[in-house]
Amino acid sequence: MRTVVATSAPKPERAYHLYGLRLRSEWPLPYPRTHGPCLAEVGLVRGASSRFSDAVKQARISTNHEMGPRCVRLADGQTYLQWSGRCEFLVSADGLVVMARPLRRSSPEAFHTYLLGQALSFALIKQGFDPLHATVVVIGGVAVAFLGESGYGKSTLSAAFVRSGHGLLTDDLLVLSDQAHELAAHPGPPRIKLFPEIARAVLGPKVRGIAITRMRKMVIPLEEGQTVGSAVPLKIVYVLGKPAPAGREPETVTIRQLSQRQACIALTRNTFNTVLTDSERLIRQFAFATNVASSVPVKLLTYPRALDFLPTVRQAILADVTRIAG
């Protein structure tokens, strides 16, 4: 097992398990501090302003701009990240350490969202993993993944399953691993992100959360019985079709099996991190997509996006999962 080494910051003291990782964090996180086997380790450490000042100077003079102005690979292999002037990160070249610094006062939930989402995805990829942009629920003991771009309805559909008694495994970022000749889906933070009006309509009028973006999206903590905290075998992947314009939406639920080639393309398009595009990562990404496409069914799911149609969509998915899982 690789050990996190942070030469310029104190050794993290708190250990958490998320996404199959052991996270050694200098920040207290509102998640269980469990122990046991893990896929890899990442240290989450506080960064002094001087460390980031040096990185910003390098980023400004760097000739490598393919990642854009807020994400720059530095000469020593580290990656400098900044999001919306809210927080900045330095991800070590080997992905073992994520150094973080909030740039302005914000809620812990907002900071955790960036730290455990976008920033952590760089560490994952540097350690050889390729996280998917997916939300996953557990149905009858198997993991069912919903893939799709932001705004396609992954979290809304998953919330409908949570409301009906199924557990959420992860929202937005999915890490898979090969275990006992099958793919295992690993749990993320026990929370879901929804717009307030959708949260109240799907989860109930008393639901509460904390706004994290200018678009008013909320982080909603889920109770113990609403989540699953251990790895679950992945049984099927649904790729959500693009929502149709008003007046042109489909009238029924359609589930169509994708060919292995189509599945590979869909899995590649729905990577969580679209920024890292070096040749080594792209080769691993193709191998990963091929492995997933050959291991589980990948299907295209189209349906009307009206909230009152969610029970019908849920029933169609339950019937399909039952046929596959037996």
What are these regions (language model features)?
Residues 157-158:
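Post-Walker A alpha-helix
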Residues 74, 112-113, 282:
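Generic structural signal for well-ordered secondary structure
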Residues 2-34, 135, 139-149, 163-326:
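Glycine-rich, often acidic-flanked micro-motifs
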Residues 52, 80, 89, 111, ...:
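Phenylalanine-focused residue identity feature
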Residues 1-107, 315-326:
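Long, basic/Gly/Ser/Thr-rich N-terminal segments
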Residues 82-143:
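Extreme N-terminal, non-catalytic leader segments
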Residues 154:
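Conserved lysine of the Walker
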